[in-house]
A protein has these predicted regions:
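Residues lining hydrophobic/aromatic ligand-binding pockets adjacent to catalytic sites
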Residues: 1-214
Length: 214
């Protein structure tokens, strides 16, 4: 969605989801895949921007070693090796700060330049579709780019139309691409694409996998 937007809103004042993708992702390995999770203190599952990382566990060093070890054979390993090392050597107290840093890394590598805003800064009290509409209004948006799975069943499209905001549905058609370690396995972290196809190749593959409709 960032590739089709001028402004990206990080929805950080919504509830953290246990076993979701807010603190974990998958990478390719010579044995198949590995799930890398960032340990967090999430008692009662507060909002994402309140989640504190459990840095007593040596997760950062382990994840860095796992990524570098498994992607050493990749064609573009040397291009991204240093950036990965720098990213995982930084210390983060809150999950939101880590996720923001990762997003900025990807944006920089793919030369995607939307402005980033945190929903918590807008102080929109509504929930669900009303919250999204409130955010769009606060930012004077002309259109809103969203995925299809949640939006088509929960978004109140008529409310957006009344506010002269066009909703654009973006469907991601998962690409099949050349991947190290054997047969292709889908739903990996974007770093899998970067290591295998570089900046230019990753951007082209992603652009060709997006279908947008109103």
């Amino acid at each position: 969605k960032m590739m089709n937007s001028e402004l990206f809103v990080f929805l950080d004042d919504v509830q953290f989801r246990k076993k979701g993708w807010q603190n974990r992702n998958r990478i390719r390995t010579n044995k198949g895949t590995a799930l890398l999770s960032v340990p967090v203190h999430a008692h009662l599952y507060p909002n994402i921007n309140k989640i504190v990382i459990d840095n007593d566990k040596n997760w950062s060093s382990k994840h860095k070693k796992s990524i570098l070890y498994n992607y050493t054979p990749a064609p573009y390993f040397e291009e991204f090796k240093n950036s990965i090392e720098v990213l995982f050597e930084k210390k983060f107290e809150c999950l939101i700060d880590l996720n923001t840093e990762i997003i900025k890394f990807v944006m920089n590598e793919l030369e995607i330049k939307p402005k980033i805003i945190f929903s918590s800064d807008l102080k929109i009290s509504q929930n669900g579709s009303d919250k999204v509409l409130g955010i769009c209004k606060a930012l004077n948006a002309d259109y809103y780019v969203t995925g299809t799975s949640w939006a088509k069943s929960h978004l109140k499209i008529e409310d957006f139309k009344k506010s002269n905001i066009t909703v654009k549905f973006q469907e991601f058609q998962h690409p099949i691409y050349t991947q190290i370690h054997g047969k292709f396995i889908p739903k990996m972290s974007v770093i899998d694409l970067l290591f295998n196809h570089g900046k230019k190749g990753t951007k082209e593959i992603l652009q060709n996998s997006i279908v947008t409709s109103s």
